């Protein structure tokens, strides 16, 4: 089958792009052609369609629901693609339930969680760092931080429930909550192998 991956950056490791790259790799291993033809059999549009070349399946990992934003305006292009799509692939049951509450149910939909290549992960060495190695347990969280990702809640939970010799490592851009604490470390953006090494 010829499949066009729409609105995806195979060079990015953000959530939808990372999922798309892994999915494309698996589909190619199974004999499908990805983004190589001008006349695809099907188009997989990530979040919203940039164009329409074939029947559309939408890959959706969430919709906007932050009441402090104009969520209806932000959801407009996502909703347009949802209405256009012949089917929808949701990232999670939560996402499916939330989307169907606001957009209505789709006749053809499925939940496919973000998978990963366990063989690839097994080849990544564990993080070995003299500062981190002195702790009994390493807690971690990573995101492209935005208010609804609740970084402050992550830190609060860690401080309330961690042991005295545990640390928290926070990875990702734009942390919207920062605290100076001898067991909390901000490491910025990490690439995929670095994140796996940390975990």
Question: Where are these predicted regions, by residue range?
Answer:
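N-terminal pre-catalytic "stem/leader" segment of glycosyltransferase-like enzymes
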Residues: 1-42
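Short donor-sugar binding/catalytic loops of nucleotide-sugar-dependent glycosyltransferases
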Residues: 9, 142-147, 174, 190
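Active-site proximal beta-strand in glycosyltransferases
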Residues: 42-68
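Membrane-proximal helix-turn-helix segments that form the acceptor-binding/catalytic region
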Residues: 71-88
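Short alpha-helical donor nucleotide-sugar binding micro-motif in glycosyltransferases
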Residues: 82, 197-199
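Carbohydrate-associated surface elements
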Residues: 94, 115
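Conserved donor-binding/catalytic core segment of Leloir-type glycosyltransferases
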Residues: 128-149, 155-161, 168-169
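Nucleotide-activated donor-binding/catalytic signature segment of Leloir-type glycosyltransferases, i.e.
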Residues: 172-196
């Amino acid at each position: 089958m010829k499949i066009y991956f729409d609105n995806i950056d195979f060079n990015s490791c953000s959530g939808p792009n990372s999922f798309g790259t892994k999915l494309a790799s698996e589909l190619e291993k199974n004999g499908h052609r990805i983004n190589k033809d001008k006349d695809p059999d099907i188009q997989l549009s990530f979040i919203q369609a940039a164009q329409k070349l074939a029947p559309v399946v939408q890959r959706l990992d969430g919709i906007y629901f932050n009441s402090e934003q104009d969520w209806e305006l932000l959801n407009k292009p996502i909703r347009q693609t949802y209405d256009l799509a012949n089917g929808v692939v949701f990232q999670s049951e939560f996402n499916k339930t939330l989307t169907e509450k606001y957009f209505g149910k789709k006749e053809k939909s499925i939940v496919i969680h973000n998978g990963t290549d366990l063989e690839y992960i097994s080849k990544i060495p564990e993080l070995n760092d003299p500062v981190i190695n002195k702790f009994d347990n390493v807690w971690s969280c990573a995101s492209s931080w935005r208010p609804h990702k609740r970084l402050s809640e992550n830190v609060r939970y860690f401080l309330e429930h961690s042991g005295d010799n545990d640390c928290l490592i926070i990875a990702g851009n734009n942390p919207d909550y920062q605290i100076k604490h001898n067991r909390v470390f901000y490491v910025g953006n990490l690439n995929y192998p670095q994140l796996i090494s940390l975990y």
